Amino acid sequence: MNPLISAASVIAAGLAVGLASIGPGIGQGTAAGQAVEGIARQPEAEGKIRGTLLLSLAFMEALTIYGLVVALALLFANPFV
């Protein structure tokens, strides 16, 4: 395997995981903060807010997992070789 392709694949895998984690991380922090604020304002709606929050956090986390899958594909099933 060409060392340049190997090095580029490792760098791309790191960037894939890093960049795929930034957006969902910011989004999850914002969503959790807003959920806590909403529960503080309306404690009777806690169950509905919590359920919606957990569902949205799962969708956001899926984006990070997709970045991990791309990184693993670049490392172990390199399409450029």
UniProtKB/Swiss-Prot annotation:
Q: How does it sit in the membrane?
A: Multi-pass membrane protein
TM segment ranges? 7-27, 57-77
Coiled coil, from the record: none
Record-level Gene Ontology MF annotations: lipid binding; proton-transporting ATP synthase activity, rotational mechanism
The feature of type site (Reversibly protonated during proton transport) is located at: E61
GO cellular component terms given for this protein: chloroplast thylakoid membrane; proton-transporting ATP synthase complex; proton-transporting two-sector ATPase complex, proton-transporting domain
Report keywords, A-Z: ATP synthesis, CF(0), Chloroplast, Hydrogen ion transport, Ion transport, Lipid-binding, Membrane, Plastid, Thylakoid, Transmembrane, Transmembrane helix, Transport
| Keyword match Nuclease | no
Q: Where in the cell is the protein located?
A: Plastid, Chloroplast thylakoid membrane
What Gene Ontology terms for biological process does this UniProt record contain?
proton motive force-driven ATP synthesis
Pfam families given for it? ATP-synt_C (PF00137)
Describe its function.
F(1)F(0) ATP synthase produces ATP from ADP in the presence of a proton or sodium gradient. F-type ATPases consist of two structural domains, F(1) containing the extramembraneous catalytic core and F(0) containing the membrane proton channel, linked together by a central stalk and a peripheral stalk. During catalysis, ATP synthesis in the catalytic domain of F(1) is coupled via a rotary mechanism of the central stalk subunits to proton translocation.
Family from the record: Belongs to the ATPase C chain family.
Report further notes. In plastids the F-type ATPase is also known as CF(1)CF(0).
* Subunit structure of this chain's protein: F-type ATPases have 2 components, F(1) - the catalytic core - and F(0) - the membrane proton channel. F(1) has five subunits: alpha(3), beta(3), gamma(1), delta(1), epsilon(1). F(0) has four main subunits: a(1), b(1), b'(1) and c(10-14). The alpha and beta chains form an alternating ring which encloses part of the gamma chain. F(1) is attached to F(0) by a central stalk formed by the gamma and epsilon chains, while a peripheral stalk is formed by the delta, b and b' chains.
What is the name listed in the Swiss-Prot or TrEMBL entry for this protein? ATP synthase subunit c, chloroplastic
Question: What is the native source organism of this protein?
Answer: Solanum tuberosum
Question: What gene name is given for the protein in this entry?
Answer: atpH
